[in-house]
């Protein structure tokens, strides 16, 4: 079906050809599932959820989901794709303790309860929960999706319910597996994508068994989508993925050894890439990254030190630090003026984007920053450094994972601008796991990390990042842990603004209408920015995308984002095609 692409300006292409890409690890064959982005329901380039593999879907009261398959759809090996593949996954896999020891995936649970699953026909299935399940549809559309179906005709031969015991035992021994469940799990991993025998619904099918230096993917002869002329996609016949050292990928991309590459390229590779375009016949597009902020400061609101905890929980202090941050300078010096000097918030590509909110307390205003610090009562001491109420100097150690010179350069600029507000900054590089554990235990004052994972949110997506819902949130890890463990660990939220965010998150989970969800999202984003729970430094940093100059339907401008977006996935590589020259098509 071509319905997903109407109005997206995709040109009719020509079939054939090979695309070359590079990866650094053999396990990255899974990126072809990301890029291929065939999903039951998927995001289009405008981040609207639409039926893809499914013919259609219907949602009632936010809790009853009816999925309709396409008549005659087949797996890549020619087996029929029907609701039997859903039934098999649900009854014989997800609810089999040997295959799923912890039970079905968490996205299938609402308040601890599983859905009622009804097979209506070979092409229609219904999942019904007692209460709304807002995570279900977005989970199906993720870059790494929730799989609620499996190729049953292929997998039944590895399941004791359908296979003779002696024959199954022979296969377990031949594959050197511990038991039938281990064998079944090895054969079935649609996302891992390392079994050439496993049928798929993706546009390209892996042909090469690991280990290998080159993996070949060929077009799926039963792929479901066609262009507006009725021609079956994908246009490209084969994708060749070579495995090379990651540090060599920029050089290889810049010497014409790839036809499409984003992974392992960094913004600082851009000048080298640009200067080689004409010689090697490629173009370098600059897409925006999709995180809320390229780099973000996380004041630890759960720090053990009471004086610092009180300060970090004072919104005036957080606002003062944000106002003392010279984002324009950071943008010019580190990002050549090409970033967006806003806070850690949604991006212009999000349908919920609010420019005024995104730039709240993001302007450089050292006078107001100092006024707020004076108002709090932090008096200037010797050397122009402010003093805490207990007499200690206002010195903040910002801990980093020490993984990039980008962080070092940015933190030096912050050191200089915060000093003008009487705040002294020190930088402490740590190993990633050490940093996380120090944050979790309340030792870290402030950490630097990337911002919101999803800066391109739409109302259907979970706003969990904006509320204390996970220990991984570096500004309030103990509050997040408390929710995750149902109070068994961590600390209960005791800051009113954070409590309000949590209440709104729970309200979003049971909201039945799109408009209600959009209103909650807008309120949560506004509060998140106004309260400056995190201090975003720069957004919309640029990601170089190298493409063969003959490659068509790849947009010159786009967002390079994991989820939503699946990197290239939402721009539909199955529609990419190679023209005969650089100028035609």
Please annotate each region the language model reported.
Residues 55-100, 126, 136, 252, ...:
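Aromatic- and charge-enriched surface segment that lines or borders ligand/interaction sites
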Residues 198, 204, 208-215, 219, ...:
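Detector for C-terminal structural segments
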Residues 2-61, 91:
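N-terminal lobe/hinge region of extracytoplasmic solute-binding protein
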Residues 11-12, 16-25, 64-67, 89, ...:
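Short, well-ordered beta-strand elements
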Residues 105-184:
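Surface-exposed binding/hinge segments that line
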